[in-house]
Design a protein with these regions (language model features):
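Short N-terminal edge-element motif at the start of the domain
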Residues: 5-83
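Aromatic- and Lys/Arg-enriched surface recognition patch
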Residues: 73-157
Length: 157
C-alpha cells in the first residue's frame, strides 16, 4: 500500500518530492511524465565519479515497518522491526545534466526548479518497476536489532 500522509504539509516543504519518481499512478501525471530519478550536489558528484550512466541499474531501498488496518486506520504493528528492504529498480535510459534542458523538457519534475540548479542530474528510466514484498528483498539481517546490519540477498553473489 502506497499513499501520501494526509497530515504532512507539502506546501511548507516545496522541495520535498517523490524520488525516485517511478510510481505512475500515485499522482495526477502530466501527459509527458516519464519515470525519473533526480540527484544533485554531492550525490550527483558521487554518481559521476562512479561512472553511473545509461544501462546501469539503480536498486531502491527504504526503511519499512509492518502495518495493519485497525478500526479503519493504517497503523504500525507494535514491536514490528524497522527494516531496510529493496522496493524497486530503474534501468537508466538517459542522463540529463543540462539545467536548461531539465527545465524545459522535464518541467514537471522537482529537479527542474531553481534550488536544484547546482550540479543537477535527472536519470530517465528505460525500464523500472516496484516489487511486492518478498523475504529475498530484505537487506536487514534476520533477528538483527540494528536495521543497518545487512545480509545481502543471494542474487548479489
Amino acid at each position: 500500500m502506497l499513499f501520501r500522509s494526509p497530515d504532512f504539509d507539502f506546501e511548507s516543504y516545496p522541495t520535498c518530492h517523490l524520488d525516485p519518481d517511478i510510481y505512475e499512478d500515485i499522482d495526477d501525471r502530466p501527459v509527458d511524465w516519464v519515470p525519473a530519478f533526480g540527484q544533485w550536489g554531492v550525490a550527483a558528484t558521487h554518481l559521476d565519479k562512479s561512472c553511473v550512466d545509461v544501462g546501469d541499474i539503480f536498486l531502491f531501498y527504504g526503511m519499512f515497518r509492518q502495518t495493519e488496518i485497525k478500526n479503519g486506520k493504517l497503523s504500525y504493528i507494535k514491536g514490528a522491526p524497522i527494516r531496510h528492504i529493496i522496493y524497486g529498480y530503474m534501468e537508466i535510459g538517459e542522463v540529463i545534466k543540462d539545467d536548461k534542458e531539465i527545465a524545459s523538457k522535464y518541467n514537471w519534475h522537482p529537479h527542474s526548479i531553481e534550488p536544484f540548479y547546482t550540479n543537477n542530474r535527472i536519470y530517465i528510466s528505460k525500464k523500472c518497476s516496484t516489487f511486492h514484498y518478498d523475504d529475498a528483498l530484505v537487506l536487514t539481517q534476520k533477528d538483527q536489532p540494528r536495521r543497518s546490519v545487512w545480509q545481502l540477498p543471494s542474487f548479489f553473489a
